Amino acid sequence: MSARQKKTVLRTVRISEELDRILEKDAKVHRTSVNALMSSIMGKYAEWDRYTEKFGHIAIPTALFRALLELIDENALATLAERVSVELTNEISSFWFKKINLETLLQFFSIACQYGKAGEIEIENEGRNYTITVYHEYGKKWSIWLQHYTDKVIRTTVKAIPQFETTASTLTLKFEVP
């Protein structure tokens, strides 16, 4: 059984007719079953929502997020990313995973991208060498934030020195675990 295949249980739930219509409609739009859609919704709750509620996360429209980023000076943004990165990541990772190491750090990055919409992430590794690529739609300043945030976290948590390549929509970082 692969890591992605998990043992399932049959659970019956009672929902309103209105909610059923909404789920049917959305499942059809996404070309999936209502069962798969509900499983996805519950997965997001289990992996993201129930934790982020405790940390005061908020959801804002992408246009507003981009506009706020544009108002911030690049140096101030970099300083802020470095200042909050380790404390925030350690606090959340400790709460979610009960420990902080390379594995939980990568899980945190993946979940933050998947549910927090930080970007689309790809993580590759060959032995001790890691390459992490984040594709996003938030512009150059988000790439700056991600670079300074991940640089500080990886140097502190993994004790590795990452190398970066950034564009307005991509951050790629490479590092070797000591």
Model-derived features with residue positions:
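Short Lys/Arg-rich basic patches
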Residues: 1-17, 27
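Short, basic amphipathic alpha-helical segments that act as recognition/interaction helices
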Residues: 22, 32-56
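An N-terminal amphipathic alpha-helical segment
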Residues: 62-131
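Generic N-terminal amphipathic/basic segments
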Residues: 58-62, 66-72, 153-155, 160-165
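Polar/charged, Gly/Pro-rich intrinsically disordered segments
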Residues: 166-178
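Short, charged/polar micro-motifs that form catalytic or ligand-binding hotspots
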Residues: 13, 28, 136, 140
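Short, hydrophobic/π-rich interface segment
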Residues: 122-167
